[in-house]
């Protein structure tokens, strides 16, 4: 959702992406044998959680240039989007899923400390792969243009 926010124009694509995510979850659970543990009354909180990632990507895109000087903005946007997404999605799941007998703020803090690094790791892998792909396309792009007109 972060990359979609950075690459797609406006906010309209977000609704389609949220629908696609729900369909993917449904298919994975119904036909792929994936556990339905996370599907609960808190599932609806994924919309604002993913929306936060989309918004962070959208904010980054407004100041993007293909220069290393935009790397701090990129990192700040990715970190902020991931943090808000994790707080909203995990917080809602912890508070509203019905999976925890006696939810407390202290226990949520312990769980957040355990799972937030995994969210950062996942985001870093996705964004690292996207950065490598973008660098490869940028390196190949000028060569193709030269050969096409040469």
Model-derived segments and spans:
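Alpha-helical membrane segments and adjacent membrane-interface helices in multi-pass membrane proteins
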Residues: 1-54
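Structural signal for the C-terminal ends of transmembrane alpha-helices
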Residues: 4-11, 52-65, 132-141
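Non-catalytic terminal and connector segments of soluble metabolic enzymes
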Residues: 31-34, 56-60, 72-73
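Membrane-embedded alpha-helical hairpins and interfacial helices in multi-pass inner-membrane proteins
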Residues: 63-150
